[in-house]
Amino acid sequence: MRELAARGYFVLCLAVGRFLRSARYSTARVVDQDGERRVRKRRLFYAPLLIWMGRLLVRILDTGVRVLPQREWEERERLIYRSLHGTSIRLDADNVLVLPVLAGRTLATLLEDPELGESFRKKAIERAVVALAEFHRLGFTHGDAMAENVLIDLAAGPLDAGAAHWFDFETVHDSRRPMAWRRADDVRALIVTSLVRTVPEKRAETLEFMLDVYADEDVTRVLTTSFTSVWRRSLTFHLAQAALSFQCFREIGRLLRARSPRSS
């Protein structure tokens, strides 16, 4: 009976998560501006209402993240682009952020490409994890570190020299949460959004590879707690990021628990 209840709760969270995922706060388009290609990103007119409504929702779901209002979002984008790329971004008079165009394709797009060879898949995942670890070492966390939010440029030199660029910094972690928790939440988001685009027989290997590349057992221990039980309020938000099956969720938890003795 408890197993049936757990599956029912999981399905409910999955359905609500899909609804949450349909919400959009902004739009972005690439334009030619002053002889250069730029990304113009603007908030949708109803975004302030969504953000206001979301404040209560994120507390109820215990997500540990929030979507930033306009001014805080602008400041965060400016700070991160300056830190990562040594470049400034402009704010147009109509509250449009003008960002540089970053090279590459999203990791999500690459992993969904049936023509992409296994070595390139592995290198793309590795580049994303390495870039996330470097981002964390700079003192930042992402807040929505999905495969959809990292660009992989495998053409940036030889295969071993491919580059990855994280983008879309509208979401921020609750600063009251421990740093290990915030980093683990980013790693979780990247792992699950990669695994849902990986064939089942390769998921265990891919999970192990990503954790080995990130190489922080303290973060792995915190990450494991996200998969100990389905009875977590944050599950709805997590399934909004990646629509895992009940079996996949359980399998990830089993693999993480099996890995935990390595830290002893």
Locations of the language-model features?
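Conserved hydrophobic alpha-helix
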Residues: 131-135
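Conserved protein kinase catalytic/activation segment
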Residues: 149-166
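Catalytic-loop of the protein kinase fold
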Residues: 137-147
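Juxta-kinase regulatory segment immediately upstream of eukaryotic protein kinase catalytic domains
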Residues: 1-22, 238-241
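ATP-binding glycine-rich loop module of kinase domains
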Residues: 17-18, 24-73
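Conserved structural core of kinase catalytic domains
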Residues: 63, 67-125
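C-lobe/activation-segment region of protein kinase-like
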Residues: 169-263
